[in-house]
């Protein structure tokens, strides 16, 4: 491995970090050889009402699947995020909030957050919410979203947070599946200068004929925008909490009692309700937050994810608050009203740790580094990446422009299903390579297998599986355990199949190559789309690229690239040929794109994930039945791509 592509841990960071390389190796070895002993000790990091004596009862046998952690202990997640900090840190700031408009700012201490959660938990009880009931939360990025989650956890209700950009149909499908009794929303949300009609979307969703379970809709007044009102069903948040008591006893929950549902897209298109339980999840979310981000008390931590995604659950609410952290929550998007916003917020709030997504980094790259001319960034210590593999070019830009070449980058790989980070560098322990998620976290046993399920040793490439359970793992698909077993444990017997492919290099570092269905087979050779995308984006005129396979008469599959150019760059046939040669030079002739379509934008979900199933269909000229596009941030992008597609059979 060339020295340019290896970023060594600095002596200063290693000396002050929670874990150095020798400690990582020792702790990791213990976590694999003696998981019972390791987790018996580390489970104590959270507070238990009845301490556990039983640690782990797990098997990945698809005929006898069992995932149980700390399973005779009892606890409460809300108490772990709030009550346990009150004696010593009641006045510490828990949440710093900045609105879409930077003039709107709030600070909430742990004591104040505790009071708000208790009052709202009592309000929920007054509306008939009881232990085990499912409550749907469809909220903007305001502190009350976290209040609602923690209030549910306090009284043993199961929250199901739906991302505030989802359509009424998407909301309805989740409400129906979970049979929610109560929905919590706001009149409107603000995002990028636009008002999002949250209450109207809820009203439309609840008109669906199969929605029969909802009794109450609690509405937060965020903007004061006009809303329709259903008497007897709708109730204002403020009117409920005005009269509610500030004292709310916690519900004692079993470690394996459900904490939340979070719906994620399945390959079939039907959302699946990922169920996470309380004990193992809280241990794992808090432990990964502390060790992966080398978190020190008093630091300001900013995760840019929306609360509607797992990253928002684990690394904006439960993990950081369990650790007594100060969390920055931003209502809007970090490149509005200008790309300078991210840097301005880091400086304004003296952010020490930043956790964001490659899609934002690439968007800022495309705008140009001049937007960071006035950015100081001296407060920043650790930076993270999450959501998809980060291409080396974006990694280096992030490191140089945002981190001023002194902040370690933790490129984290995990999933909604895993509850927390599984493969990641640790800042004081791991030399990093741009584009690699590097090594497994404690207790995590990744392996690569071929398509027959045979384990591959050494430097190789294959399907990424996990050989044993970890505490943060999902327990089932809500209401469909068979689907859980089928999706994750039937493909490779005795293993959890992640659905991702990966490469392991000569140093044992893992490189995520993309979903296994994002692998192109060109003339019998497997190519990860992420690899071709990385090569394209490393060209200075390319802002973003998405690569898919399409039917090819000779090769079986050809390579079809959608390319977004940097602002001000002219599209031309010459540039198209230049990019083909560029990829050929970067990877090899085999990886040369057959077709390159210019794209002003790519179809993305509101969390920034590129929806490649649309791109695959357009590339294959199958444009008559593309399926539901309601989850896209901008469905109009699809029409443009169809009109300018290259593979027409006309």
UniProtKB/Swiss-Prot annotation:
Keyword Nucleotide-binding attributed: yes
Catalytic activity: acetate + ATP + CoA = acetyl-CoA + AMP + diphosphate
Modified residues (N6-acetyllysine): 609
Function per UniProt: Catalyzes the conversion of acetate into acetyl-CoA (AcCoA), an essential intermediate at the junction of anabolic and catabolic pathways. AcsA undergoes a two-step reaction. In the first half reaction, AcsA combines acetate with ATP to form acetyl-adenylate (AcAMP) intermediate. In the second half reaction, it can then transfer the acetyl group from AcAMP to the sulfhydryl group of CoA, forming the product AcCoA.
Pfam family, one: ACAS_N
InterPro entries according to UniProt: Ac_CoA_lig, ACAS_N, AMP-bd_C, AMP-bd_C_sf, AMP-binding_CS, AMP-dep_synth/lig_dom, ANL_N_sf
Entry GO CC: cytosol
Keywords: Acetylation, ATP-binding, Ligase, Magnesium, Metal-binding, Nucleotide-binding
PTM info: Acetylated. Deacetylation by the SIR2-homolog deacetylase activates the enzyme.
UniProt keyword Lyase present: no
Binding positions for CoA per the UniProt entry: 191-194, 311, 335, 523, 584
Binding positions (ATP): 387-389, 411-416, 500, 515, 526
The EC number(s) this enzyme carries: 6.2.1.1
Primary enzyme class: ligase
Name this protein carries in UniProt: Acetyl-coenzyme A synthetase
Organism encoding this protein: Shewanella sp. (strain ANA-3)
SUPFAM superfamilies: Acetyl-CoA synthetase-like (SSF56801)
Molecular function as annotated in GO: acetate-CoA ligase activity; AMP binding; ATP binding; metal ion binding
């Amino acid at each position: 491995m060339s020295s340019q592509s290896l970023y060594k841990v600095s002596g200063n960071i290693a000396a002050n970090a929670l874990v150095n390389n020798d400690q990582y190796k020792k702790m990791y070895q213990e976590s694999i050889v003696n998981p019972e002993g390791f987790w018996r000790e580390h489970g104590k990091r959270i507070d238990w009402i009845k301490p556990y004596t039983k640690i782990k009862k797990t098997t990945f046998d698809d005929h006898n699947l069992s995932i149980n952690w700390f399973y005779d202990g009892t606890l409460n997640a809300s108490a772990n995020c709030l009550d346990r900090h009150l004696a010593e840190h009641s006045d510490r700031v828990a949440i710093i909030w900045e609105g879409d408009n930077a003039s709107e700012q709030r600070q909430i201490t742990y004591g104040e957050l505790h009071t708000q959660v208790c009052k709202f938990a009592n309000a929920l009880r007054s509306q008939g919410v009881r232990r085990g009931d499912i409550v749907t939360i469809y909220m903007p990025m305001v502190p009350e979203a976290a209040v609602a989650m923690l209030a549910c956890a306090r009284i043993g209700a199961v929250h199901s947070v739906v991302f505030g950009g989802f359509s009424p149909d998407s909301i309805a499908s989740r409400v129906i599946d979970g049979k929610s009794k109560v929905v919590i929303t706001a009149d409107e949300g603000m995002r990028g200068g636009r008002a999002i009609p949250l209450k109207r979307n809820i009203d439309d969703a609840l008109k669906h004929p199969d929605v029969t379970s909802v009794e109450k809709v609690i509405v937060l007044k965020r903007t004061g925008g006009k809303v329709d009102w259903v008497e007897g069903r709708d109730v204002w948040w403020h009117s409920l909490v005005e009269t509610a008591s500030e004292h709310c006893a916690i519900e004692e929950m079993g470690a394996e009692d459900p904490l939340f549902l979070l719906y994620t897209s399945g390959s079939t298109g039907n959302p699946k309700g990922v169920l996470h339980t309380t004990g193992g999840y809280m241990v794992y979310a808090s432990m990964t937050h502390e060790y992966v981000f080398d978190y020190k008390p008093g630091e300001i931590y900013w995760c840019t994810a929306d609360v509607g995604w797992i990253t928002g659950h684990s690394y904006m609410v439960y993990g950081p608050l369990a650790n007594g952290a100060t969390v920055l929550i931003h209502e809007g998007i970090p490149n509005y009203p200008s790309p300078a916003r991210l840097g301005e917020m880091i400086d304004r709030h003296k952010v020490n740790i930043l956790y964001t997504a490659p899609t934002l980094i690439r968007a800022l790259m495309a705008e140009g580094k001049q937007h960071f001319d006035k950015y100081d960034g001296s407060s920043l210590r650790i930076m993270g990446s999450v959501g998809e593999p980060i291409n080396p070019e974006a990694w280096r830009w992030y490191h140089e422009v945002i981190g001023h070449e002194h902040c370690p980058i933790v490129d984290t790989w995990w999933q909604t299903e895993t509850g927390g980070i599984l493969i990641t560098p640790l800042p004081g322990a791991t030399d990093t390579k741009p584009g690699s998620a590097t090594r497994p976290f404690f207790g995590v046993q990744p392996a690569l297998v071929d398509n027959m399920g045979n384990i591959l040793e050494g430097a190789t490439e294959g399907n990424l599986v996990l050989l044993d359970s970890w505490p943060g793992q999902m327990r089932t698909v809500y209401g469909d355990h068979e689907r859980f077993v089928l999706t994750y444990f039937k493909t490779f017997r005795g293993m959890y199949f992640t659905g991702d492919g990966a490469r392991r290099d000569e140093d044992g570092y893992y490189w995520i190559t993309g979903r296994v269905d994002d692998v192109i087979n060109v003339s019998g050779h497997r190519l990860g789309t992420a690899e071709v995308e990385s090569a394209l984006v490393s060209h200075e005129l390319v802002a973003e690229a998405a690569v898919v396979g399409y039917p090819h008469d000779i090769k079986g599959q050809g390579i079809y690239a959608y390319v977004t150019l940097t602002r001000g760059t002219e599209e031309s046939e010459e540039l198209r040929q230049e990019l083909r040669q560029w990829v050929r030079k970067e990877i090899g002739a085999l990886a040369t794109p057959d077709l390159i379509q210019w794209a002003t934008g790519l179809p993305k979900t509101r969390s920034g994930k590129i929806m490649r199933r649309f791109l695959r269909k357009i590339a294959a000229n199958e444009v008559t039945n593309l399926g539901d596009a309601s989850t896209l941030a901008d469905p109009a992008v699809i029409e443009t791509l169809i009109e300018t597609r290259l593979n027409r059979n006309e």
